[in-house]
Each structure stands twice: as C-alpha cells, then as structure tokens.
Amino acid sequence: DEPLDSKHNEWLMKNVLSDGGQFTGVSDLVTKYGLVPSTVQPETYNSNNTRKIDELIILKLKEYALELRAMNADKKAKKDKLEARKVEMLSQVYRMLVLAYGEPVQEFTYTLRDVNGKEISTETYTPKSFYEKYVGKDLKNSYVMLMNDPSREFFKIYEIENDRHVMDGANWKYINLPIEDIKKIAIESIKDSTMMYFSCDVGKFLYS
C-alpha cells in the first residue's frame, strides 16, 4: 500500500535481485532443497553467463510488481484473485529459470569412487538425502558470519534487511569485528582444518 515512489519501494525496484550472495543464503538454500554433484546437473551456458537471464528476470519481476499493484488498487479486487495471479507469475518466472538452467533434479544415482577411480558404492539419492549424507552438518546453526565494517561499531551484531535467498530464510546477519581479530580466527581455522568461507568487496577494482 506504500506509494510507488516511497523510499522502501524505490529501493526494492532498484534491487530486484543480485547475482551472488553470502553464506546465510547458501545455508538456507541447501538446507531446504539439498545438493547434487556437478556430474548430475552440469553447468549450462547461462549458468556461466548469468547477466542476460538476470536482466530478463528483473524486467519480468518489475512488470509483475506493477501489475499486482494495479490489481490491489482496485477496491473490488479479492485477495484470492491476487494470490492466484501471483502463482501464475511465479510459474512463468520458474519456466524462464528452467529454460536457462535446466529442470531441478528430483532423484539421481551416484557412484562414489576412491582416488584411483575404484567404485566404493552406488546409491540413489534425492538432493536432500545427498546433502544429509555427504555434508550432514547443520549449516544454519553451526556457523556465524564475521565481517569487518569500519563504518559501524565493532563487537556488535548487525542484520541487513531484505537480504535473503528464500522467503522463509534468514537475513544476512554478522558480527562486526576488527580485521586483526578476523585474521587471527582465520589462522586458527586453518590450523584445525576447519574451512572458513571468505569473501571481500572487490567491485571497485573490477574495471581499474
């Protein structure tokens, strides 16, 4: 019901989706849907060159947002009609994604081999059962995100609104620490063979 030119809606229309993300989003996705080996669902041209499909999805979502706003502005519009139309819209977006990336795998057979290529076992999995067997950890509750943001006070937890990969997932939440502390934690994680996910803001260097 907010005006289209409100600060909130203006931000949403400028940030429809982003091609990337962070650990919270990944943990939400794999916990909900699972994982498959790349041999089961290989990369496509579009998964290696995502800009064009991103642009098409963004345009389609903006179009749908304006249509839903117009329907909602009609006093006679019923909620069930709005919901039904939204489902139709999401079905079209899903179709676009499937055409670009392929239909999500529901079940597959996977052969585990040793370093010499000798077969160890062959089993049938769903993406969820594969994730549970070969990852197993509770990614959503076993890890925390650390960040070095000098523009904000250190030793506090921050949450980024509307930064999530799934609607029922969690926003990007992190503990803000001095870079010296993060370096020490990174060194300790290497020493005890615990993998540490790492990313950095390099956008300003891409075209320098």
Range-by-range predicted roles:
Residues D1-S208:
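Structured alpha-helical subdomains that flank or immediately precede key functional sites
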